[in-house]
């Protein structure tokens, strides 16, 4: 490559990277994946190293992020600069990082490092004076960010006041959206036909930039902190000499600190931690796109200093990009339990994150228009939140002209009824649509709803075909003679199913509300509604104002719930369920026997896991999905997963199922059978 060719390519890359910086940092709406962005930055960096005369202080390789050009929040200048991190993509590059440290310090390693998960969120800076939070701001370009104090304060774990800290203090961290909250939010947005978020990082950024803090508060944001700006030297003088100790100091001061950090010696030690965490990546409750490796000894940080863009004492060791190219072969349309029609893309099968992917949701009309996706397109796919296959972007440069636009059906693909269009959402209004009935019963019987074991998809189809059930209330009218004789259904199987159906009557209001599929009502909201109203009769008479008082309920959701509660067909369904003996009262709270305790469950229990979780919550405990230092007990069933290993590493006490029930008996004076 000649100098002129290099100059032309460097200018192209700089313009392209600046554009994508603006999309990512300012609009929180990136058009390319992190892996593609890293490739562009890497190409630019290599060209600048090969042709030093092309280096420039305004190059993206010398800068962090993008200045908030059209900020909707007040710009604030950080007292000390917030840097980005350089990246390593393989062990050789990690080793090269250690060798640079050795040369700069004039001595051989190995050195001690602190290794932390690189939480994929939005970097923030909290500024305190005399222990009082003055403001919180986004990173922006590293020198100027946007003040987002009110929105940050909707995260309950962020301290407003501190004791025993330097007079002026900056605390740095990451605001993120847990995967579970991200999936729930996208489900709600999709249901309303609104634009969904591409990943948890975008969802966190978009939520933190809301003008109304009440919206931010309902998004389930979390924060983790890991560094100091102003005030670090004073803290060092107090005896905090390492990054590992600094993380402990932050925890002692009340800041949430991501629990999975570790010490390692030398590049080989870091590699061992990296490989271990890479395997466990999808067990994390948040998205992590790598690990952050920092020299542990803080005194060495000052010796090494910074480049224009990043510290020399730290590096981001990125996980491999889990994205694949494939073709969209066709689009089919599915009808859900609410009648909403969802397009599903049929892909040339690809292997992604341990499983074959051949279908991908295309969500709604807004999503298809935004992507400009067509049948025959080459697409880049990944798993959103590490769970759901999703199209990341369309590879338009590979179009041949033979691609076809996606046409929405005018009639229901299941029953032929003419579809209604509500904004960008297409719905089948036919109450007798077989697809709506099937999905409603399948959801009602699912594990987190009424948990009717043995009522699988094939059996639901047969019950509908034979006219034995038309809706969920009909399940409670089934008799043994109705079931015996159905394909693969003998007398014993029929008895077992009827026993499961009978037991489901006692699940309580919380599970019933989730099972009935009220609009926008997931597990958390069902729990909140049950706690607020106590029984179905009171909920049926709720006003809009009363619904808006419920935690996690916004105005759109409240109006949709109210419309359903007033619907005569819904009220008739509730009446028939009540006549069948389905309990419609919230489960008795059970006092505060376990208040202040946090439980996590792993492995198979003798009782349904959701039943045990509900019992623990009724007794005042908190039940989470991941083990941390805040976990009081890990309940261990048969065939436990990686949570057991993590609990042992953190020193978290474990209980067998039998030991758990003994603990409950000691705390409540009742046996487990009496409590369930």
UniProtKB/Swiss-Prot annotation:
GO function terms (MF aspect): DNA binding; DNA ligase (NAD+) activity; metal ion binding
Enzyme class, UniProt record, top EC level: ligase
Limits of the BRCT domain: 589-676
PROSITE patterns (alphabetical): BRCT, DNA_LIGASE_N1, DNA_LIGASE_N2
EC number: 6.5.1.2
Record's keyword terms, sorted: DNA damage, DNA repair, DNA replication, Ligase, Magnesium, Manganese, Metal-binding, NAD, Zinc
Organism: Thermus thermophilus (strain ATCC BAA-163 / DSM 7039 / HB27)
Endoplasmic reticulum in keyword set: no
Purpose: DNA ligase that catalyzes the formation of phosphodiester linkages between 5'-phosphoryl and 3'-hydroxyl groups in double-stranded DNA using NAD as a coenzyme and as the energy source for the reaction. It is essential for DNA replication and repair of damaged DNA.
Signal peptide positions (record): none
Chain positions recorded as NAD(+) binding sites: 34-38, 84-85, 116, 139, 174, 294, 318
Alphabetical list of InterPro entries matching this protein: BRCT_dom, BRCT_dom_sf, DisA/LigA_HHH, DNA_ligase, DNA_ligase_AS, DNA_ligase_CS, DNAligase_adenylation, DNAligase_N
Keyword set includes Ligase: yes
Catalytic activity annotation: NAD(+) + (deoxyribonucleotide)n-3'-hydroxyl + 5'-phospho-(deoxyribonucleotide)m = (deoxyribonucleotide)n+m + AMP + beta-nicotinamide D-nucleotide
Pfam families: BRCT (PF00533), DNA_ligase_aden (PF01653), DNA_ligase_OB (PF03120), HHH_2 (PF12826), HHH_5 (PF14520), Nlig-Ia (PF22745)
Single Gene Ontology BP annotation: DNA repair
This protein's name: DNA ligase
Chain sites annotated for binding Zn(2+): 412, 415, 428, 433
This protein's encoding gene: ligA
SUPFAM superfamilies: BRCT domain, DNA ligase/mRNA capping enzyme, catalytic domain, Nucleic acid-binding proteins, RuvA domain 2-like
PANTHER family the record matches: CHROMOSOME TRANSMISSION FIDELITY FACTOR 18 (PTHR23389), DNA LIGASE (PTHR23389:SF9)
GO cellular component terms, semicolon-separated: cytosol
Active site location: 118 (n6-amp-lysine intermediate)
Protein family per UniProt: Belongs to the NAD-dependent DNA ligase family. LigA subfamily.
């Amino acid at each position: 490559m000649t100098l002129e060719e290099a100059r032309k390519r460097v200018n192209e890359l700089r313009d392209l990277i600046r554009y994508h910086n603006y999309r990512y940092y300012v609009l929180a709406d990136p058009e390319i994946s992190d892996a593609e962005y890293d490739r562009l930055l890497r190409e630019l960096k290599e060209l600048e190293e090969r042709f030093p005369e092309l280096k420039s202080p305004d190059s993206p390789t010398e800068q962090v992020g993008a200045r908030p050009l059209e900020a909707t929040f007040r710009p604030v200048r950080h007292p000390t600069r917030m840097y980005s991190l350089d990246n390593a993509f393989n062990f050789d590059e990690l080793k090269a990082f250690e060798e640079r440290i050795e040369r700069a310090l004039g001595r051989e390693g190995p050195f001690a490092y602190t290794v932390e998960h690189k939480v994929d969120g939005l970097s923030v800076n909290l500024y305190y004076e005399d222990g009082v939070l003055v403001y919180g701001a986004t990173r922006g370009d590293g020198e100027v960010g946007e003040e987002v104090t009110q929105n940050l304060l909707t995260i309950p774990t962020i301290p407003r006041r501190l004791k025993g800290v330097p007079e002026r203090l900056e605390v740095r961290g990451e605001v993120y959206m847990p995967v579970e909250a991200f999936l729930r939010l996208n489900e709600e947005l999709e249901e309303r036909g609104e634009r969904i978020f591409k990943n948890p990082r975008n969802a966190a950024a978009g939520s933190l930039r809301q003008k109304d803090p009440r919206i931010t508060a309902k998004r389930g944001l979390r924060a983790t902190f890991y560094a100091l700006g102003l005030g670090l030297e004073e803290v060092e003088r107090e005896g905090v000499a390492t990054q590992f100790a600094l993380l402990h100091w932050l925890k002692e001061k009340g800041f949430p600190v991501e629990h999975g950090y570790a010490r390692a010696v030398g590049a080989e030690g870091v590699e061992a931690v990296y490989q271990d965490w890479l395997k466990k990546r999808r067990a994390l409750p948040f998205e992590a796109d790598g690990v952050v490796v920092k020299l542990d000894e803080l005194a060495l940080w000052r010796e090494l200093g910074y480049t224009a863009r990043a510290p020399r004492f730290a590096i981001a060791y990125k996980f491999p990009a889990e994205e694949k190219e494939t073709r969209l072969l066709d689009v089919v349309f599915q009808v859900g339990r609410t009648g909403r029609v969802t397009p599903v893309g049929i892909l040339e099968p690809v292997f992604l994150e341990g499983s074959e992917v051949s279908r991908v949701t295309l969500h709604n009309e807004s999503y298809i228009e935004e992507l400009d996706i067509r049948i025959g397109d080459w697409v880049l796919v990944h798993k959103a939140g590490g769970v759901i296959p999703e199209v990341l972007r369309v590879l338009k440069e590979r179009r041949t002209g033979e691609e076809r636009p996606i046409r929405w059906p005018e009639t229901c693909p299941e029953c032929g009824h003419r579809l209604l269009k509500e904004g960008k959402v297409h719905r089948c209004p036919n109450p007798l649509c077989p697809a709506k009935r099937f999905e409603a019963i399948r959801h009602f019987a699912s594990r987190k709803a009424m948990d009717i074991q043995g009522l699988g998809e094939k059996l639901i189809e047969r019950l509908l075909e034979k006219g034995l059930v038309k809706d969920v209330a009909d399940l409670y009218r089934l008799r043994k003679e109705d079931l015996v004789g159905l394909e693969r259904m003998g007398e014993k199987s029929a008895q077992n199913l009827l026993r499961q159906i009978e037991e489901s009557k006692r699940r309580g209001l919380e599970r019933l509300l989730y099972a009935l599929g009220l609009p926008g009502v997931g597990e958390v909201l069902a729990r909140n509604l049950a706690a607020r109203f106590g029984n179905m009769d009171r909920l049926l008479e709720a006003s809009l104002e009363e619904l808006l008082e419920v935690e996690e309920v916004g105005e759109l959701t409240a109006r949709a719930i109210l419309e359903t509660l007033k619907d005569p067909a819904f009220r008739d369904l509730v009446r028939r369920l009540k006549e069948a003996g389905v309990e419609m009262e919230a489960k008795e709270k059970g006092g505060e026997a376990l208040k202040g305790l946090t439980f996590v469950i792993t492995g198979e229990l003798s009782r349904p896991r959701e039943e045990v979780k509900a019992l623990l919550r009724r007794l005042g405990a908190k039940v989470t999905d991941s083990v941390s230092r805040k976990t009081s007990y890990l309940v261990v069933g048969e065939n436990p997963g990686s949570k057991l290993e993590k609990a042992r590493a953190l020193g978290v006490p474990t209980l067998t199922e039998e030991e758990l029930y003994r603990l409950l008996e000691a705390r409540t004076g009742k046996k487990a059978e009496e409590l369930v």
